[in-house]
Regions:
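N-terminal glycine-/serine-/threonine-rich beta1-alpha1-beta2 phosphate-ribose binding loop
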Residues: 2-101
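Short, ordered loop/turn segments at secondary-structure junctions
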Residues: 50-52, 110-112, 118, 136-138
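Short catalytic-loop micro-motif centered on adjacent basic/acidic residues
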Residues: 82-83, 105-108, 131-134, 158
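ADP-ribose/adenylate-binding Rossmann-like module
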Residues: 99-115
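Rossmann-fold NAD(P)-binding glycine/threonine-rich loop
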Residues: 110-131
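Rossmann-like NAD(P)H-binding beta-loop-alpha module
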Residues: 132-194, 205-206
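Substrate-binding/catalytic subdomain of NAD(P)-dependent oxidoreductase enzymes
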Residues: 184-281, 286
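Conserved small/polar residues in nucleotide/adenosyl-binding loops
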Residues: 287-291
């Protein structure tokens, strides 16, 4: 295919914070790698921000920066919108407006997907567009699309996984090195593996939102993460780890959801003792894994 015939996929992005800046850099640096896979060149046409001056310093071409959402929503050339704003609003309204405008939407916003996923998916279906949220669950592990494909042929009865890398890092270090929770959390923060305010991770809220998304998917109904029993790892001590090791087990923070008759669900996030024959026993440090 000649350069004249080369197809261009034009993208709009909502937000240019930490995640958005990362997406921008990937799109800029991976053009050659993406071209043979997509059969097209990707062009980031517009980025919606609040602070133009701050955002302009992060990009090569400041003309792609805008404070007007309508510039993205009303641009017929923009086929895909990447939402990296975070939070529920105005992200929710923007996503719905983009779908109604005939654009496909990609997000990693697990808070929004967990609470409003059903409504957004309905809007996507109504408009014949894709709403993709693979990155909102289990990071780099492609779990959402395989679940969709499995659901076409059969019903999934149960899903269990380690869905938060920060807590798994902490528990692995506590298990292998005999370190305290506070000491490992501090190390994780210094290494950039954990936020300064790590409540969402260590209290299990992040994993809870993710299992809510997966529960909604396997059941076909909206599952609110507030309705799921959630217990984090802040109360786990060095003594607990020694006790688990003496029993030939290790402690992992598991998120689990199981379907019962009548499409009833039981979902839970809690620390569990696993024996070596458990498929998640050897998932260590920052790795996450569904099973």
């Amino acid at each position: 295919m000649s350069m004249a015939e080369e197809r261009v996929i034009k993208i709009g992005m909502l937000g240019l914070g930490t995640v958005g800046t990362g997406v921008y850099k990937v799109l800029k640096s991976q053009q050659e790698e993406m071209l043979p896979k997509l059969g097209a060149r990707v062009e980031l046409k517009k980025i919606l921000v609040r602070n133009v001056e701050k955002a302009a310093a992060k990009v090569d071409d400041p003309s792609i920066i805008t404070t007007s959402f309508e510039e993205i929503a009303n641009d017929p050339e923009i086929e895909i919108v990447v939402e990296v704003m975070g939070g529920k609003q105005p992200a929710m309204n923007y996503i719905l407006a983009c779908l109604d405008a005939g654009k496909n939407v990609v997000t990693a916003n697990k808070d929004l997907v967990a609470s409003e996923g059903k409504k957004i998916l309905a809007a996507a279906k109504r408009n014949g567009k894709d709403f993709l949220y693979e990155a909102s669950v289990a990071g780099g592990i492609p779990i959402i699309r395989p679940l969709y494909e499995c659901l076409m042929g059969e019903q999934i009865q149960e899903i269990t996984g380690i869905l938060n890398g920060t807590t798994n890092f902490i528990l692995t270090k506590m298990d292998k090195e005999g370190a305290s929770f506070d000491a490992v959390l501090k190390e994780a923060q210094e290494l950039g593996y954990a936020e300064r305010n790590s409540e969402a991770d260590v209290e299990g809220y992040d994993a809870c939102r993710k299992i809510a998304i997966l529960s909604s998917l396997i059941s076909g109904q909206q599952v609110d993460f507030e309705d799921i029993y959630c217990e984090g790892i802040t109360e786990i001590t060095v003594e607990d780890m020694k006790y688990a090791k003496a029993m030939g087990t290790t402690i992992k923070l598991l998120a689990s959801s199981r379907r019962y008759a009548g499409n009833r669900l039981h979902a839970i996030v809690a620390p569990c003792m696993l024996y070596p024959d458990h498929p998640l026993y050897n998932v260590c440090l920052l790795y996450t894994s569904p099973s």
